Amino acid sequence: MRVADFSFDLPDELIARFPKQDRTSSRLLSLDGPSGVVEHKVFSDLLELVNENDLLVFNNTRVIPARMFGQKASGGKVEVLVERVLDEHRVLAHVRASKSLKPGNEVILEGKAKATMVARHDTLFELEFEHSQNVLDILNDIGHMPLPPYIDRPDNEADRERYQTVYGEKPGAVAAPTAGLHFDDKLMTALKNKGVQMAFVTLHVGAGTFQPVRVATVDEHIMHSEYIEVPDDVVAAVANTKANGGRVIAIGTTSVRSLESAAKVHGGKLDTYFGDTDIFIYPGYQFNVVDAMITNFHLPESTLIMLVSAFAGQNNIMGAYNTAIEQQYRFFSYGDAMFLTRK
């Protein structure tokens, strides 16, 4: 299977660089996997697409202001993008500098925080901050929201709220689980009032989610690793939903990857799992847990467009993307959404 089979041409003006004023006013393209039928809706119409006893599984990670600018103690400019918080004082980070950091090198970030490079792990640098402050407090104080590279503008104060789900509560992501950006408190309440069940997994989205696939064939690609938590209350909620004839609806590819990973490590049967995952889902994958999903529109030739193609059918997805372009849908993190049922 060729990576080029997942390519499409996107006009630049369809890349959403700012969020819509109202979270639920985004457009929603509904694609039925078995039939390939497409319908055009708005996100608030989700209430009509879900049923009582369906289970929505959200990713409750919270985006940290992970990007910092500063200089090396020796004077050169440096940019730090935190990939993972290791503990109260240490992080793994991508570092851009004129000369690569060496163990013992110090950096001064935003003129306020001092960190020392203590080790290198492949392309990531382990940085240790001074112990007078918790690293999350430092990031909240001086960090910038890590907007994706295709949102080619500086972050602003509004991004601190809008590049964040309303239900995110566990800091650790360096990219938003973007399908969740369309939910507001009013919609969450309306869904609960309808009898829709809710459960929460955690996947701390890493910067690797934006890394391009650099191989020609899909099965050559090596997936990045991310930390997930699928607690036992989620396992119980899924079992109860299936027993009552409801659907498990994943909110975003991160929720899909979390649920399917927790099933994969247990031989295809969902069970509790806390740990790393590098699951790579592409056409041919047999889903064990998820029946439907909500997702944004993804980059061409990305692992995420491969995942949704595995879920709803590659021809269906590529056709729906062409339709979305014709209909002027907004693409990527701040863009519109899709509701997919499994083929």
From Swiss-Prot:
The keyword Transferase applies. GO terms for molecular function: S-adenosylmethionine:tRNA ribosyltransferase-isomerase activity. The keyword S-adenosyl-L-methionine applies. Pathway: tRNA modification; tRNA-queuosine biosynthesis. Keywords: Cytoplasm, Queuosine biosynthesis, S-adenosyl-L-methionine, Transferase. It is an enzyme of class 2 (transferase). This is S-adenosylmethionine:tRNA ribosyltransferase-isomerase. It comes from Pseudoalteromonas translucida (strain TAC 125). The lineage of its organism: Bacteria, Pseudomonadati, Pseudomonadota, Gammaproteobacteria, Alteromonadales.
